[in-house]
Amino acid sequence: MTMSSFLINSNYIEPKFPPFEEYAQHSGSGGADGGPGGGPGYQQPPAPPTQHLPLQQPQLPHAGGGREPTASYYAPRTAREPAYPAAALYPAHGAADTAYPYGYRGGASPGRPPQPEQPPAQAKGPAHGLHASHVLQPQLPPPLQPRAVPPAAPRRCEAAPATPGVPAGGSAPACPLLLADKSPLGLKGKEPVVYPWMKKIHVSAVNPSYNGGEPKRSRTAYTRQQVLELEKEFHFNRYLTRRRRIEIAHTLCLSERQVKIWFQNRRMKWKKDHKLPNTKMRSSNSASASAGPPGKAQTQSPHLHPHPHPSTSTPVPSSI
C-alpha cells in the first residue's frame, strides 16, 4: 500500500481525472515493476499507463491516436489554454462547442464527470481579461449612443450664451437647433401679420394723410347669374317697390342697398342708350322760351292784327 500510494503521488495524477478502475491497475503494476527502494522504478512513471491503453480505447471514442489520452491526462494546462480566448471572443457561435472533442475543450470524457470551465479573466490573468473586454467593447448596444446625443445638444446650445467668454452683443455663431425651432413650421398655429402697407387701397390718388385705417368701400362684383336676374327684372319694370326689392335681394344673396344702387345705375345707362333729354333741362328751356325778350314781344303785337277783316261787321254809332 505504501508503494502504490507513492507511485500515485509521483505521477501527479489528480483523483478526479482518471476513472476509478485505473487506481487498482496502477497499484498492481507498481508492486511488480519497482522495488521498495529501487531507483529505476521511480524514473519511469509513464510506463504503467501505456501498457493499459487498450483498456482505455473503448472509453475515448474521440481520441485520434494511442498517445492522445495520455496527453489529455498528463499534459500541462497551458496546452489547452488557447481555446479560452476563442470561446470568450465569440460567445454567440454555437459551432465551437460541437467542433472540438472532449479532450481538447476541457479534458472531459464520456466516462467521467465534466470539469467546469474557468472564465478567461481568471485563467489568463488581468492582462488577458483587459484584452477580452477591449475586444468585446464594440459589441455593446450601439443604438443607445445616438439616442443620448439629441438631449445633450440643446443643453450645449442653451449654455453657450451664458459663458463669460462670449459677450451678450457679440457676433457669436447662432445655434442651428435653436434656429430650427423658429422655422416657419413652428408658426403654423399663428395668424399671419398683415401690415398697413399690405392692405389694398381703393382710391384713385394716394392720400398722404391716410393713417392705415379702414380702406374705402370696394366695388361690388356681381356674378353672371345675379346680373341676368337683375336684367330680367329691369326689363319688366324699371322701378322697384320696397317689397319686390327685398325679395330680389333675398333670392340673389344681396343687400337691399346693392339692388337699389344697381337699378339706379341701370336706369342712367338706359337713358344714355336711348338718348333721351334730361327732364330737368327740358323744363328750364320751355320756361325761358315762353317768357321771351320784352321788346320783341311789343313790336310783334301790333303786327298780329294790323287791319280788321272786311267781312267782319262792326257797329257804327248813329250819332255821327
Curated annotation (Swiss-Prot):
Residue span of region Disordered: 19-77, 101-168, 273-320
Q: Where is the composition biased (Low complexity)?
A: 52-62, 159-168, 310-320
Q: What is its main location?
A: nucleus
- Check the record and name the PROSITE patterns matching this protein: ANTENNAPEDIA, HOMEOBOX_1, HOMEOBOX_2
Please give the GO cellular component terms listed in this UniProt entry. chromatin; nuclear body; nucleoplasm
Query: Where along the chain is composition biased (Gly residues)?
Result: 28-41
Q: What InterPro entries does its record include? A: Antp_homeobox_Deformed_sf (IPR050609), HD (IPR001356), HD_metazoa (IPR020479), Homeobox_antennapedia (IPR017995), Homeobox_Antennapedia_CS (IPR001827), Homeobox_CS (IPR017970), Homeodomain-like_sf (IPR009057)
By its UniProt entry, which Pfam families does this protein fall under? Homeodomain
User: Which superkingdom heads the taxonomic lineage of this protein's source?
Assistant: Eukaryota
Mind listing where the DNA-binding region sits, in residue ranges?
Answer: 215-274
SUPFAM superfamilies recorded: Homeodomain-like
User: Per UniProt, which keywords does this protein have?
Assistant: Developmental protein, DNA-binding, Homeobox, Nucleus, Transcription, Transcription regulation
Q: Where is the composition biased (Pro residues)?
A: 139-153
How is expression of this protein distributed across tissues? Embryonic nervous system.
Asked if the keyword Nucleus belongs to this entry, the reply reads: yes
Entry's localization field: Nucleus
Is Nucleus tagged as a keyword?
A: yes
Residue interval(s) of motif Antp-type hexapeptide = 194-199
Any one Gene Ontology biological process term?
A: anatomical structure morphogenesis
Which GO molecular function annotation, any one, does this entry have? RNA polymerase II cis-regulatory region sequence-specific DNA binding
Which family does the record assign?
Answer: Belongs to the Antp homeobox family. Deformed subfamily.
Purpose: Sequence-specific transcription factor which is part of a developmental regulatory system that provides cells with specific positional identities on the anterior-posterior axis. Binds to sites in the 5'-flanking sequence of its coding region with various affinities. The consensus sequences of the high and low affinity binding sites are 5'-TAATGA[CG]-3' and 5'-CTAATTTT-3'.
Q: What is this protein called?
A: Homeobox protein Hox-A4
What organism is this sequence from?
Answer: Homo sapiens
Gene encoding this chain?
HOXA4
